[in-house]
Amino acid sequence: MLSPRLPHLLLAGCLALGCHPRATATGASSPAPACELGPASGDHQHDFDFEFGAWTTKLSRRLRPLTGSEEWVGYEGTSVVHPLWDGKANVGELDVGGPAGRIQGLTLRLYDPSTRRWTVRFANSRDGELTPGLVGGFSEGRGEFHDQETLDGRPICVRFVFSEVTRTSFRFEQAFSADEGRTWETNWVATFARVER
């Protein structure tokens, strides 16, 4: 049974398994220009409204990203997303399991009306620390969020993409780039199906 008490996004789970790197100690610096998105236009406060509610999810995670590895592991589980502040924020809980273990993660997404951008941050049950955020938004049904972080001591760009959004389903992908965003390697793919009540 899905828990509506605790708030998700599969990325928090990715962090829990080490495929989403933590930002460096220089987290106060802004992302590299190649990792940034341009300015947003229009009101995007309700971009994530489609995700409110309970979902089942199937996801695949690439082991050892940016090493040439083609080894993937699968997970299945649930996600529950709760709206806050009339859509200006939301919090979600992800709980999935598979051969590589269990992922329990919490996502916090906050909307900044002055920039018309969202910031996505994560915590996981392993250490409870809140990560620096990826910044972005939606355009023409596609959500894209970027950040610059480090992986094994080298700077990388991180990209989240939400796509194929309908009332009852959507797709999420995470990708890393070691060349300032010229090429991307996908390392996390998840599909979501709404739990009808």
Which ranges hold each PLM region?
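Bacterial N-terminal signal peptides
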Residues: 7-18
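N-terminal secretory signal peptides that target proteins for export/translocation
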Residues: 1-4
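Hydrophobic small-molecule pocket/channel-lining residues, especially in calycin-type beta-barrels
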Residues: 20-197
